[in-house]
Amino acid sequence: MQNFGKVAVLMGGFSSEREISLDSGTAILNALKSKGIDAYAFDPKETPLSELKERGFQTAFNILHGTYGEDGAVQGALELLGIPYTGSGVAASAIGMDKYRCKLIWQALGLPVPEFAVLYDDTDFDAVEEKLGLPMFVKPAAEGSSVGVVKVKEKGRLKSVYEELKHLQGEIIAERFIGGGEYSCPVLNGKGLPGIHIIPATEFYDYEAKYNRDDTIYQCPSEDLTEAEESLMRELAVRGAQAIGAEGCVRVDFLKDTDGKLYLLEINTLPGMTGHSLVPKSAAVTGVGFADLCIEILKAAHVG
């Protein structure tokens, strides 16, 4: 096996997704140790990143979700320290965390995305409601794990929802509702993995459904995707990742409308690795267990 040296599993951090990061990090740490890797937990909230060098770490497995962890900040710090790290680089991480600018890139390349509008204080909210229709989804551009996602159903409520959310990270986006189904497709080192059909017990796949409930249904392989649709989803996921320069292990979320058309919703350049997480479920279908998945991700650690 490749010699990774002393490995820091970066977990925890400062974002609203800290607890999820700690859960993912603990699972990864145990998996790496089971494979004989000299791995240790490292929480930047407790210990400055500069101590990575001082403590002799040679590789970083980054599982810091959210702000500072997957937005290019920690990636830039690791570049300066010269420590190889897993996942996407600075630019791809920043773009992937910014749903608005990621959508602009996908649109420019002809990839299908749901119609959307960016909201500001002086937006004509009635016009946006008329354009996108109801219901619609409203979300902050730079939060993860569905933090701050609201489904707006009543006419005239868009402005009040915007006021509730505008303190969150990034622009606030209103997005056309696509009925039909929610899916996710991982990409591992440039290769699309089996798509997952997500059937939440809640109204949509929110934070509660992702992390706190055991009645969300995950179908992998998906029972309602044709072979052609599955192939197209993998192709679009790979193209979506390549469009922003994403590397390593990423996950692209999709919506499918009632006519069967697929839409790219967003990309997660640092997907979760908890018991509820989607990437391990998809990898398992291909015969790759959790520990081996962690090793494959670690193999792609890089600087620059």
UniProtKB/Swiss-Prot annotation:
Chief localisation class? cytoplasm
Chain segments annotated as transmembrane: none
Q: Name one GO molecular function term.
A: ATP binding
Can you supply a Gene Ontology BP term from the record? peptidoglycan biosynthetic process
**Enzyme class, spelled out:** ligase
- What's one Pfam family here? Dala_Dala_lig_N
- Location(s) in or outside the cell: Cytoplasm
Q: Quote the SUPFAM superfamilies the UniProt record gives.
A: Glutathione synthetase ATP-binding domain-like, PreATP-grasp domain
Q: Which UniProt keywords apply?
A: ATP-binding, Cell shape, Cell wall biogenesis/degradation, Cytoplasm, Ligase, Magnesium, Manganese, Metal-binding, Nucleotide-binding, Peptidoglycan synthesis
Binding-site residues, ATP: 129-184
Name the needed cofactors: Mg(2+); Mn(2+)
What pathway is this protein a component of?
Answer: Cell wall biogenesis; peptidoglycan biosynthesis
Catalytic reactions of this protein: 2 D-alanine + ATP = D-alanyl-D-alanine + ADP + phosphate + H(+)
GO CC, one annotated term: cytoplasm
Q: Which residues form the ATP-grasp domain?
A: 103-299
Highest rank taxon of the organism: Bacteria
The record's free-text note on cofactor binding: Binds 2 magnesium or manganese ions per subunit.
UniProt keyword Manganese present = yes
Q: What does this protein do?
A: Cell wall formation.
Q: Which HAMAP family match?
A: Dala_Dala_lig
Q: Which family is annotated?
A: Belongs to the D-alanine--D-alanine ligase family.
**Could you tell me what this protein is called?**
D-alanine--D-alanine ligase
Lineage from the top down?
Bacteria, Pseudomonadati, Pseudomonadota, Betaproteobacteria, Neisseriales
Name the encoding gene, please. ddl
